[in-house]
Amino acid sequence: MSNFAKIFQSNWIDLNKLGKLEIFLKTILGIYKAPNRTHLLAHAADISSFYAVKNIYEYMKNDDEGKEILKNKPLLIRQDIQFNELKKLPKNTLGYKYMEFLETYKLHAHDREVAHFFDNINYSYILTRYRQIHDIGHVVYNLNISIESEAALKMIELIHTKLPITLLAILVAPFMSPLYRFQYIFKDKIPPNFLNPNFDYTYXDDYNYIDELSLKQYVYNLTEYFHIDKINNNLFFQKLYKYYFDNLNNSNHIRGTIIYGYNNENNNDIIFDDINNEYIFLKNPEKNYFLFKYKPRQTLLNQLYPWAYMAGMAAKKPLHSIHIENWLDKDIDIFRKTYNIIPLPDHLNLMSGIN
């Protein structure tokens, strides 16, 4: 018996159509109230995806590589993959990049929900595999886990899978994406009083840039992602972590991100920001941090979605029908070239790429 056969037997939930409809409506309501509860999204996808998954199955059983995947049902789990060995691979291999992504964002393939509501083991496997391969999509397309990056990947997945839940994500994401995002990038370490209400976010320098904003005009929230490897103060870390989860999906406020360990190699204090078509003040020597300002919603609609549509159409095969497991020790650029995968453009890398 394959590993997935055991997983299928222990996770299958037998429900009639009325029961599935009830769960679907409850999960949609739950997603609206708490978008970060990903298992609700998974349940909604289970129930709404029957015809899309059936079409994926028909495609895979008529494709040599897809047929092999359906027969062996490989999984990105510890029983099938030696994850620690992937860390020892050369740095430009798909497996190394995959592990680097998972560890950067504190993720694991085991976290992906198994499909519960399919009677057919092949259908259940296809949706489960799609969820596990999702992180591979982040890696090969070079997308981080911000709302707008997730939405761009959903656009690619919609083209490849036709899953209704991907369309829902694409439609909802612009309303969840913040209008502005401020990134404070600290050269040395985050000041201990950064979250203190009295911390001065304003600029007292001679330089100004178009539409300069004092952050005191807004409720400043920390969201998206941050690195904590240089923080020794546990109390500060706990406070930062709480801010992160409290505001993870709150798009009613201006939202910010902390990253640090960045060195300014630009000789000029004023640079032209091609993303937002404006001049920005880059360096603040006195406070020892740099500021970048993005417009995620605008970038998602005007740049990320068009690129994602083009990338989705250009790919030779959807990721779920590629035997990814055989590529983990291969060069990621060769993988991209083989399947004509177009990664995120360089000019969007700082905002939406894996950093």
Swiss-Prot record:
Which Pfam families does the UniProt entry name for this protein?
A: Coq4
Any further remarks? This protein may be expected to contain an N-terminal transit peptide but none has been predicted.
Q: What role does it play?
A: Lyase that catalyzes the C1-decarboxylation of 4-hydroxy-3-methoxy-5-(all-trans-polyprenyl)benzoic acid into 2-methoxy-6-(all-trans-polyprenyl)phenol during ubiquinone biosynthesis.
* Cofactor(s) required, per the database record: Zn(2+)
Compartments it resides in: Mitochondrion inner membrane
What positions does the entry give for Zn(2+) binding?
Answer: H134, D135, H138, E150
Q: What is the lineage of its organism?
A: Eukaryota, Sar, Alveolata, Apicomplexa, Aconoidasida
State the pathway, as annotated in the record. Answer: Cofactor biosynthesis; ubiquinone biosynthesis
Could you give a single Gene Ontology term from the biological process aspect? ubiquinone biosynthetic process
Q: What is this protein called?
A: Ubiquinone biosynthesis protein COQ4 homolog, mitochondrial
The keyword Nucleus is assigned to this record: no
Q: Which GO terms describe its cellular component?
A: extrinsic component of mitochondrial inner membrane
Taxonomic source organism = Plasmodium yoelii yoelii
What are the alphabetically sorted keywords of the record? Lyase, Membrane, Metal-binding, Mitochondrion, Mitochondrion inner membrane, Ubiquinone biosynthesis, Zinc
Q: Look up the domain of life of the source.
A: Eukaryota
Report the EC number(s), separated by commas if there are several: 4.1.1.130
User: Membrane topology for this entry?
Assistant: Peripheral membrane protein
Point out the coiled-coil segments of this chain: none
- HAMAP family recorded: Coq4
Quaternary structure, from the entry:
Component of a multi-subunit COQ enzyme complex.
Per the record's keyword annotation, is Iron included, yes or no? no
Q: Which family would the database say this protein is a member of?
A: Belongs to the COQ4 family.
Q: Which reaction does it catalyse?
A: a 4-hydroxy-3-methoxy-5-(all-trans-polyprenyl)benzoate + H(+) = a 2-methoxy-6-(all-trans-polyprenyl)phenol + CO2
